Structure formats: C-alpha cells, structure tokens
Amino acid sequence: MSEIQKHDHLLIETPPTVIGFSSVRSFGAEFRSRPRNRATHGELLESQWRAIWAKHDEDEATKPHIVALPAKDGIYVHFEGAPDCNLKIDSLEDKRQGIVLLNAMTHLSSDESGEHEVENAVVYVPNNKRNSFLKKIEDYVQSEPSEKGTFKNQKLMESIEKIRFAFWDSMWTGRPEDRPQDTPLWCEVWLRNDKRTVVDANVENVTRFFEICAKLNIAHKNQILFFPERNVCMIKANAEQLQQLMDN
C-alpha cells in the first residue's frame, strides 16, 4: 500500500460570514405538528417552565458554591418535541435577549407501536430573561385568531411536548455508548464565544473555563481551537464532573 501523501494545512485569512441557525427541511415538506388544546397545553407548558425555575432557585439557595468559582447566571433548558413531529427549533432562540440555542438533535424512542423520531433542543436562558417564554405562552393562550385562524406562537407551542432541565448528556453529540460514566474519559468541549471572528476569539472565556476545571479537579489539555462563536478544548472527566461543569 502506498503511503498517504502529506500536505500543508490550509490557512484561511478572510473572516467567515456568520449565518444564523435555521431548521433543515426537505423541499416542499410540511411542518409536522400535533393539534393541541390551547388552554390545556398552555397550562402544562407553563407549569413545567415554572417548576424548572423554582427548582433552580431552590438549588442555588442550598447548594455549596465552590470558593472563587464564577457563578452561572442562567440555566440550560431541554425542549422535547412530539414523536414523529417537528420541533420549531429556530423560534426557541433569541440572541438579542441572550437566549441561545446550544444543541439540536434527533433521537429514536420506542413504544408498543414501534420506533419514533423525537426532535430535541437545548437552550441557554439567562436568569433575567426567565419570563420571556412565559410571555410567549401567554400570547399563545390569550391571543385572538388571525385571518387564517391561527394564534400567536401556535406553531412553536404545539411543537413542544415537554420541557425539563438539560443535564450534561443533553449536550452530548457523540455516540451514546461513548458517554463517560464513572471513569474519566477525554472528550471535546465546545464553549460559546460571544465574538464573531476568529481574530477576536475570546481567550478569556477559555481561561475562565480552565480555572473552573482546576477547581473541580478536571484534567484538560492546553491546546485550543478557535472558531467563530465557538472555542474547542479537551478535558478528561466522568459523568459526575461533566454535570458539575454544567451546574457551575
């Protein structure tokens, strides 16, 4: 077998253009959703949303904070769609308010009728924007029908089956069988970067993350990859440590 020829790395000097996330749909495919009773479904989503924040406030008041560890000023929320339906993922994000889509994925679930595709999304919501989603629910339930007979935020609300806290495995994008358990494993961490170009990559963001890793006794490599809006580094952690990272 001939040896693989080696080439120099490609260096792209021109800053890239940032394009916002949009759901991938087949041409002409209809958005699949499940009809809902507005009052009942709105009440369910509101109760789940309020329960998430009540638990968050309780945990913040009782959990021991690690000295010198920077406090997280928001939570990660996991939105789950209905089986074999679409989740209106692009409407979950509002960057102007700091509400950021972090992960979108499709899982398979099984029941007595067979296997079903379930769309999921993880969104970061700042503490001071916790009422933003409640306002969307309120508009959905209380709005008057449009000329087409639809209601405000109807497509978004009807696409959501349930809302819960996002745990570390909600952020895992690799194979499920590769997830760390009790034994620490090397894995990539993609850190959000508020800057929009590689040149302006937020090194302080990574430095702060490494400080958190040190406080939690999590090993890491010093090499960093900078991309627009994301910084990538390697850490060696188990499931418990990954959850601690998300909690802090």
For each feature predicted by the language model, list its residue ranges.
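Autoinhibitory N-terminal propeptides
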Residues: 1-212, 248
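Short acidic alpha-helix initiation/capping motifs at coil-to-helix transition points
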Residues: 203, 222-224
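Protease zymogen maturation seam
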Residues: 225-231, 236, 240-248
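Beta-strand-enriched, solvent-exposed domains that form extended recognition/catalytic surfaces
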Residues: 216-220
